Amino acid sequence: MSDKMKLTDYVTEFLQKKGIHDFFGYQGTMIAHLVDSIEHNANTKSHSSYNEQGAAFAACGYAQAKDSCACAYATSGPGAVNLLSGVADAYFDSLPVIFITGQLNTYEYSGIDGLRQQGFQEIDIVSMAKPVTKYAVQIREAQDIVRELNLAWQIANTGRKGPVLIDLPMNIQRGEVSDPVYDMKFSDEETEAAVYNRKDGGNGAAFYREAVDKADSADAAEAAEEILCKLKEAKRPVFMIGHGAAGSGEKILVDIARKHQIPVITSVLARSVLAWDDPLNCGCIGGAYGHRYANMIANAKSDLLVCFGISLCTRQIGTKVHEFARCAQIVRVDIDPYNLQREIHEGREGEKCFCVSAEDVAERLAAAESRISSYGDWLEVCRRIRRELTQVDNETPERYPNRMIAYLSDQLGDTGAVAVDVGQHMVWSYQSFHNKQDQKILFSGGHGAMGYALPAAIGAHYATGKPVACICGDGAFQMNIQELQWVKRENIPVKMVVMNNEALGMIRHLQRDYFDCVYADTSDGSGFSSCDFSDVAKAYGIRAKRIQGEDVENASGEFLEQNGPELLEIMLENGTYAYPKTCLGEPIHNQQPYIPKPIFDELMEI
């Protein structure tokens, strides 16, 4: 006789066997069977958010902090739709998350084409999710879950990782599954067809293969050999590491860089690859707000950029793409062939692309590292550039929030992860947060979703088992402020820092520069206002304190040393700014406020 089990019991057990023990979601009729199965499994726990978006961002934070798969769920209709911003966040930042939605009973479907809604809280969430998932499917027969769940898992966790969505009608949830399988494997052709069929209506795998073929090679050994040859010729090489090299790949690359004194520049999402004070750390590339020294080293000083899992999009290298690193050779390693279709050097002159895993290439480089020279003198040049340009920025009065972030980063201690929201505080944080070794800083990168940080920090706590922190602005914190109740209910040890300038500062800066200082909907008195967040936190039963920005060093230390959840609200001036900033049309290493010419000329000459 075949073994039989309830479908949602199988789903729960499958994910538990894969290492997922914490599930994030919000209860509802059409997802009740799944939640019941999670409750009855001795090795799993459901954590209820207060909006499904919070659950989705918690799953993103969990996946980022643990470098592994996460799961979030929601009921049908509005519950499922509320997940979508988190689904998009996982998609753009390559996070493997299994999203599960409840749905109307299949027997309630009318079969009438064009009917606006099949029943109460019914919505075609699969079609809505397809553009921001690697795979999305509705299960119409209970036994199909075995193949589809195994397939979805493999798709989420291989290649360029990302989210999948499984839509479960209520009657299917309570159905039975025969002969459950937990380790079904699929060929590359099967997974590619499943992922890419939606791109062109049926020839997805061929479409994907065509994109791969436009790279120079999909062979890791060939990519490693090209890099080794280029390193032999180079005098001023740089490793550029992005989120696509996350995990063991980045560790191997850092080890190689350390042994051979190769400077390392990262993307924002890969900001945690190196500790703040690591001698190899040459900052974060950024077309608008990157570190001055990173932008100068990459764009104007290096003669070889070896890029691992970094997209080199306009957000990173500026809008004048063909002018980036004109004097450098570029070798790009990326698992996503579509990223490699971005042409950096016009006509691909001095640019080689390899559609292959960064980890595979890193392993081959490590095996042949006796062929790599040491670049200690060049690293010293880069460290000098970092020191001198950091000093230039420290003398900029408008950067006082950066100094607060630097101080707070030392006060937050050994937090397992720090989630940062979207706004000016994000720039201040990735520019100035002094992260320790193995302390992760989490961002909503590609999607740039306000309201991300608090729930992401919650998810990171369950991923690491350690105290966590989040840094938010007054605009972003308001977006998912209801999750303070989640923090209180489960006594989550999260230190919340709200930097309150009573404005949407990033847009206010834009309005000052381009809209004649008309601050529509961004400032108090002009259509926007903020509350007293410390009072709100106290209403939830959470310890909270409100201080003025100039009092940070005197008033924050003892407060942040307490156990349990705490909120520190820091009042800033209304007119805050993020610097350095690249103006439209300028090279990314020539940011405002401009470097004094004698210093600029001297650094360009060394």
Language-model regions: role of each:
Residues I166, F308, V333-I335, V420, ...:
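Active-site flanking residues adjacent to catalytic metal/cofactor-binding acidic residues
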